[in-house]
């Protein structure tokens, strides 16, 4: 039987080769020529490391040769250095197989297959063999479906594998997300795109860099069926396409983009063309839009060609760049965006200028480069986001019921898998048997989720007391996401770190710790131990600046070689002797740590530093030597407003450094556990003053209004070396009093979750104000809302009024896990909306539909509503507190 299977496989392969052996991957000769030219340029850029040897394989078919050339012509450096050619060939053959075996394979246009099926890379994730693994699981599940229904089915499969959970910025590979059983939206959408492409369905990740009306961003998926692109929420199956919880927020968006692998010649607006991808703008698919032209002039009124023009949205208390253009010879550039406000920041040669642009109201804007570092200014800016204009497809009650039934089954499948992760009891017993710290081990193994066996195996190899202590410390130094996907050989490698510093803290954080920035962890210490001579190691340890000079001389920096990818591994940089600046910095720190020299990338400023007993020494590769920065102090006075006594970094204010080019670089302070009210605040950072490099900065503050608008202020600051700069941190206020915006019957009944009794809101809450929330269990907008409320637990408990949280039905109540939101105020009452309170709110407040959740109102027993929020809103807790403090 096995021999027959092998013979069948060989026959299938021979038939496939015969069918496409001499066929072209690119039938357009002119496009094929352009790809060949781009490929030759890529090869010329990377002469070292023997990175393209797979193309010398004489057995490659014409199709495979061209497909490989297409991939290598445009793939970022990390994909060339960190994955062998055989990996890319395997994926080409897997995509061919899907095209042959799936019923829609022959109907996919060549250009869509080339750009949206063949490429393995979706965004900046780590690559893996997901295409092969997923195809085996999905092929029989979708092969008898229409293309439209297959897209829906693949998303149901993804929901079996993962649900939403926020995490850090490093993007997990698709298989790591499946192993973990959750991921943030960027990881869920990467998973879904990978799964769709595995069965030959064109798919792409759509990303709004920042929402205009709330402090967050989001990613979802578009898939192609029957001649058009449809959108869907990844791992959030709906009965139909073009439906998701984000329909309404997306209609308020100002920019939606996707990165298309290679040179793409589609119909969408092109934002930029880079050596690795074409960035397109798909905002027209989601919201009403308008075009605007920007003219940049100097102070004499002359057009400025090749000026950098950044289109910025207020989000997370900074003006974040969502699109960058350069002016033409006439000093002009343009953008299509949603009908709201952006800040346009133009710069060239150290001069800069800025102005607000209201898309839909202004067709043209002139920005004058009338400022430079050192100028003093304070500017108030009122930002208005686009209005909501969502169009939702119809879903029948039968479709909704069937979808809900399937979601419940999928939840049970995923939960059964998660139930096989190690339990706390088993983790503690393991720690006891191996003489390890029980509390630490239990926390680590539970955090590792599907990767716990790797972590446990590593722990079994810790034999001595010192190694046990050091090994646990190593696991505590790396991130929670690292625990979920790190390999055993990586952990073993870094446990063998050289000890050259007597400072134990430096050794733990800046030598043994494998984590430098946002890179995937690799066993680079063993690698460097093999490729760097003993004599060079001794020289670099004695004089680390010699190592700086070597890197500056031997590692070529190309800012465009790795766009759209994670950092190149240290091993990859060594092989190619080429890197983007960030990968070069990680390479240097990794190289230093491999020799026992403490080094880091400063989290706030992004500067590379050597760590000595005398402090941090900045590394300057351009000067190839020490660069001791001149420092000063910045302090700010703050007069509390009624609803805010201690502004938070990223929520209410940020600080950015003005670069020599005239643009802004955010100081990236630790966010802390923001869900629990952590992170940097005015009192911890600026009340007594903080040390900064001397130079010019911009302080941005902003008050987010319930409407989504912002009252912002920008203030320029100059920090002098050895001096102290004092400024004011001003939170602008909306002086209008809280207004009655609707009515709601406080005698409305609900069923209490505890006891199952029907009770009116008046009975449950007593006379006065109260909050009612209608929840969408396990939906991302509701999860965000509950975490926001948890972060302001103390304020809401101090207020003392009841928060009635209602589930739409008993089934939804059964899915809710109170332990996931243990930080909610003690004034919460849970219930079930058996009397359709949601419909009453929707009708009275003129909301569009009741199934867009969550819905929150603040009302009183005189039946007056003073606050309403529906759907996706970041900072809900703060908005609630701001409103109740104004009552």
Residue ranges and their predicted role:
Residues 226, 328-344, 348-351, 357-360, ...:
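Short Pro-Gly-centered beta-turn/loop motif in secreted/extracellular proteins
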């Amino acid at each position: 039987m096995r021999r027959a299977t092998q013979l069948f496989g060989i026959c299938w392969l021979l038939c496939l080769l015969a069918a496409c052996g001499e066929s072209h991957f690119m039938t357009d000769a002119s496009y094929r020529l352009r790809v060949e030219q781009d490929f030759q340029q890529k090869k010329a850029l990377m002469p070292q490391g023997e990175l393209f040897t797979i193309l010398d394989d004489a057995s490659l078919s014409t199709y495979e040769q061209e497909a490989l050339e297409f991939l290598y012509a445009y793939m970022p450096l990390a994909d060339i250095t960190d994955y062998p050619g055989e990996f890319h060939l395997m994926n080409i053959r897997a995509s061919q197989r899907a095209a042959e075996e799936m019923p829609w394979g022959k109907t996919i246009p060549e250009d869509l297959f080339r750009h949206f099926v063949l490429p393995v890379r979706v965004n900046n994730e780590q690559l893996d063999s997901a295409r092969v693994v997923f195809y085996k699981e999905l092929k029989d599940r979708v092969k008898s479906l229409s293309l439209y229904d297959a897209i829906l089915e693949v998303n149901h499969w993804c929901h079996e594998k993962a649900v939403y959970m926020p995490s850090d910025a490093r993007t997990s590979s698709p298989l790591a997300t499946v192993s973990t059983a959750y991921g943030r939206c960027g990881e869920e959408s990467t998973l879904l795109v990978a799964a769709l492409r595995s069965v030959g369905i064109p798919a792409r990740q759509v990303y709004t860099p920042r929402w205009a009306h709330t402090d967050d961003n989001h990613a979802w998926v578009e898939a192609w069926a029957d001649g058009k692109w449809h959108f869907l929420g990844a791992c959030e199956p709906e009965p139909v396409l073009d439906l998701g919880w984000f329909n309404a927020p997306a209609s308020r968006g100002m920019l939606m983009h996707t990165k298309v692998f290679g040179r793409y010649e589609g119909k969408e607006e092109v934002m930029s063309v880079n050596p690795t991808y074409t960035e397109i703008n798909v905002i027209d698919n989601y919201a009403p839009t308008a075009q605007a032209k920007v003219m940049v002039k100097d102070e004499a009124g002359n057009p400025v060609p090749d000026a950098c023009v950044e289109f910025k949205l207020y989000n997370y208390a900074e003006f974040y760049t969502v699109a960058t253009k350069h002016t033409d010879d006439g000093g002009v550039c343009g953008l299509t965006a949603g009908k709201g406000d952006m800040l346009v920041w133009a710069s060239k040669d150290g001069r800069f200028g800025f102005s607000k642009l209201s898309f839909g109201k202004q067709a043209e804007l002139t920005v004058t480069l009338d400022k430079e570092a050192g100028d003093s200014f304070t500017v108030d800016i009122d930002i208005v986001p686009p209005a909501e204009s969502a169009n939702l497809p119809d879903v029948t009650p039968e479709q909704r019921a069937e979808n809900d039934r399937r979601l419940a089954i999928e939840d049970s499948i995923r939960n059964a898998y998660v139930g096989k992760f190690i339990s706390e009891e088993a983790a503690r017993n393991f720690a006891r048997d191996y003489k390890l710290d029980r509390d630490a081990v239990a926390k680590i193994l539970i955090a590792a989720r599907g990767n716990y066996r790797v972590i446990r195996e590593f722990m079994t190899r810790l034999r001595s007391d010192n190694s046990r202590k050091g090994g646990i410390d190593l696991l505590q130094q790396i991130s929670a996401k690292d625990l979920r996907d790190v390999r055993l050989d990586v952990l073993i490698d870094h446990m063998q770190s050289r000890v050259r510093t007597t400072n134990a803290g430096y050794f733990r954080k800046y030598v043994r710790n494998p984590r430098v920035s946002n890179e995937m962890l690799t066993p680079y210490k063993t690698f460097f131990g093999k490729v760097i001579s003993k004599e060079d190691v001794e020289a670099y340890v004695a004089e680390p600046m010699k190592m700086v000079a070597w890197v500056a001389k031997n590692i070529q920096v190309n800012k465009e070689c790795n766009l759209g990818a994670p950092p190149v591994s240290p091993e990859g940089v060594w092989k190619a002797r080429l890197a983007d600046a960030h990968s070069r910095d990680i390479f240097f720190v990794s190289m230093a740590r491999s020799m026992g020299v403490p080094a880091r990338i400063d989290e706030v400023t992004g500067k590379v530093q050597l760590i000595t007993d005398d402090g941090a020494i900045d590394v300057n590769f351009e000067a190839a030597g020490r660069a001791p920065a001149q420092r000063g102090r910045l302090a700010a006075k703050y007069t509390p407003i009624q609803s805010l006594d201690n502004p938070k970094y990223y929520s209410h204010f940020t600080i950015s450094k003005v670069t020599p080019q005239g643009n802004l670089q955010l100081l990236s302070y630790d966010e802390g556990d923001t869900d629990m009210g952590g992170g940097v605040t005015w009192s911890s950072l600026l009340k007594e003053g903080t040390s900064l490099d001397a130079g010019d900065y911009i302080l941005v503050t902003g008050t987010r209004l319930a409407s989504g608008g912002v009252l912002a202020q920008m203030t320029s600051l100059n920090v002098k070396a050895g001096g102290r700069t004092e400024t004011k941190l001003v939170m602008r206020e909306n002086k209008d009093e809280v207004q009655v915006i609707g009515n709601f019957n406080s005698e409305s009944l609900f069923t209490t979750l505890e006891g199952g009794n029907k009770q009116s809101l008046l009975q449950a809450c007593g006379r006065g104000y109260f909050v009612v929330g209608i929840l969408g269990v396990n939906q991302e907008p509701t999860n965000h809302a509950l975490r926001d409320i948890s972060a302001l637990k103390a304020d809401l408990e101090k207020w003392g009024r009841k928060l009635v949280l209602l589930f739409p039905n008993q089934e939804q109540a059964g899915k809710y896990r109170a332990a996931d939101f243990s930080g909610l105020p003690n004034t919460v009452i849970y219930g079930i909306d058996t009397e359709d309170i949601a419909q009453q709110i929707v009708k009275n407040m003129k909301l569009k539909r009741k199934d867009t959740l969550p819905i929150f109102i603040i009302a009183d027993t005189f039946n007056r509503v003073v606050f309403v929020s529906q759907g996706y809103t970041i900072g809900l807790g703060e908005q609630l507190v701001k409103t109740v403090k104004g009552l």
